[in-house]
Regions:
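Bacterial N-terminal signal peptides
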Residues: 4-16
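A short aromatic-anchored loop/beta-hairpin motif
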Residues: 20-201
Length: 201
C-alpha cells in the first residue's frame, strides 16, 4: 500500500514538473519572446521575433525585433548632436501606431518613465528618456529605437499560439541586440524546436 502511494506521489510530482516546464515555453507573458512559426500567413509577421512588453486578459503588445529599417535614428532626433555618426537605425516595431516611437535599452533603470521588460532591459515611449539615452557617449550603448508596435485584442494571441503560429520562449538580450537580422529568426525557431522536443521525451 505504501509502495502504491509512493508511486502516486512520484507520478504527481513528475506531472506537475512537466506542466510547469511546458508552461514556461507555451504561456505568453511580458518579457517572453514570440517566434513566428513557418506556418505564419500574416505577411507582417512572417519570420519575425516579437518581444512582449505587455500581456493581460485584455490583450497583448510587443515589438518586432528583427526588422531594421534603412533609416538613421537621427532623422527623428535631429537635435541630438553626433547621433548620425553612431549608425543607429530605426526598427519596425509593428503595424500598430506607426507614429509612436519606443526605446529598448539594456543597462541602468532610466527611471519612472520607463518599464522593466525583463532582467535589465527597459522600454520607454517618453521622448525625454530617449533623448537622454541616445545622447550618451559612454555607458548604456545597447539600445534600439522602434516605430510602431504589434498588438493583439483579448484572447487573440492565445488563439494564435494554440493554432501553432507562434512559439513562446524566455527572452534574452541576444534576440534584441543581434548581429545578423537575417539569421536570428531561424536560430530561435530551431531553439524552440529543441526545447519542445525535450519536453515531450
Amino acid at each position: 500500500m505504501r509502495f502504491i502511494l509512493l508511486i502516486g506521489v512520484i507520478i504527481s510530482f513528475t506531472s506537475a514538473t512537466l506542466i510547469s516546464a511546458e508552461s514556461e515555453y507555451t504561456t505568453p507573458a511580458a518579457g517572453k519572446l514570440l517566434v513566428a512559426d513557418q506556418t505564419m500567413l500574416d505577411p507582417r509577421f512572417i519570420q519575425t521575433i516579437v518581444l512582449l512588453f505587455r500581456y493581460s486578459k485584455d490583450g497583448a503588445a510587443g515589438l518586432i525585433l528583427n526588422h531594421p529599417m534603412n533609416v538613421n535614428v537621427s532623422k527623428i532626433f535631429p537635435e541630438i548632436p553626433g547621433l548620425n555618426s553612431k549608425k543607429e537605425f530605426l526598427h519596425f516595431g509593428g503595424p500598430v501606431a506607426a507614429d509612436t516611437v519606443f526605446l529598448l535599452v539594456q543597462g541602468k533603470d532610466p527611471g519612472d518613465k520607463a518599464e522593466r521588460v525583463f532582467q535589465n532591459v527597459f522600454i520607454s515611449a517618453d521622448k525625454s528618456v530617449m533623448q537622454e539615452e541616445l545622447g550618451h557617449t559612454k555607458g548604456q550603448e545597447k539600445l534600439h529605437v522602434y516605430v510602431g508596435y504589434a498588438g493583439w485584442g483579448a484572447g487573440q494571441l492565445d488563439m494564435e499560439i494554440a493554432g501553432g503560429h507562434w512559439h513562446v520562449l524566455p527572452a534574452d538580450t541576444k534576440a534584441i541586440f543581434y548581429s545578423d537580422p537575417e539569421k536570428i529568426w531561424q536560430e530561435y525557431l530551431d531553439r524552440s524546436d529543441v526545447l519542445q522536443a525535450s519536453l515531450i521525451r
